[in-house]
Amino acid sequence: MCNFACAYCPEYLHDGKVGFPKYDDALWFVKELSKDKPDLFFEILGGETTLWPKMISFVNEAVNINDNIVIEINTNGSRTRNWWKRFAESNVQKNVVLNFSYHAAFCDPDLYYDNLFTVAEAGYTVASNFMLDPPYFDKVVDLWKRTHNLPIGASIKLLRPGFDSHKLIDGYTQEMLDYIVKTNMDDRHAIEGDANWDINVFADEEPINWQERVIEKKHSFKFWYCSAGSKRFHVNLFGDIRPCSQLTSYINDGIPHEEDKRYLLGNIFKRDFRPYEDLIVCPVDYCPCKIDAICYKHD
């Protein structure tokens, strides 16, 4: 469920047909992961995650279950100023990182900036992704520059149609692509806050420019060994637990094709979970999701 309807996002994220997980099922999954993975990174994606009425309660209860958990909440930052003040006052700075994304076609830039300011001032670890929709280039860049006075990480991001693995949306000029690469090479990756959260991508122990890799289509790890499924898990809208975002299925009302079932690790609604015991060989052509990319892998 989402309150935006961005043209580049899949329709199922904002068509209103899929709601939120049951509170107890979500907590069950945190408990299961915490049994043998005490240092846990838990990413919450949408739709718009902060529309979940149980969000603040869930975060606080998850921290009670596992004091070492780090929860990343992905949000478009569009809730009211009062909502974000209430969230900031929950005092979970050690355990929560906030990953904002600015979508210029729908989001009020002043509201977005004010909400960034609120959580950053409260000491939360905050990153802001400025989604570069070509018709809004100037609007996006202006707000990105405006946030440079805030203690946050800020970067301009490429957009892919419907989360395609390697294509970019139409409308990018070479000047825009060069600007994205250049701004992702600066020092804006330094993110302040109490939570331990490193989202830089490394290759052979050297940091790389991930946006540049995607533009140049150098983001393939096919046939590499990967810890997805043993250390990294992705839960789709229908509760299916899978190794990563590329090995998931949203088709057919959540019923996977026969060939997809081999990558099914369980379902949180059925309270069934069977992680892999070792690395898998990557079967996909491209790995566009940054969180999938930072998952340990080798050739």
Model regions: which residues?
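Flexible mid-to-C-terminal extensions adjoining Fe-S/redox cofactors in radical SAM and related proteins
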Residues: Y12, F238-D299
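Radical SAM/AdoMet-radical enzyme domain recognition
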Residues: L27-E43, W52-S155
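The −1 position to Zn-ligating cysteines in a subset of zinc-ribbon hairpins
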Residues: M1, A5, Y225, V281
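N-terminal pre-triad scaffold of radical SAM enzymes
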Residues: M1-Y12, D39-I44, K231-V235, G239
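Radical SAM enzyme [4Fe-4S]-AdoMet core and its adjacent flexible, acidic
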Residues: S101-R232, L237-F238, R242, I251-G254
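Active-site flanking residues adjacent to catalytic metal/cofactor-binding acidic residues
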Residues: G47
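Short, cysteine/histidine-rich loop/knuckle motifs that typically chelate Zn2+
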Residues: Y8, A228, V284
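Canonical Radical SAM [4Fe-4S] cluster-binding loop centered on the CxxxCxxC motif
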Residues: M1-D25, C244-S245
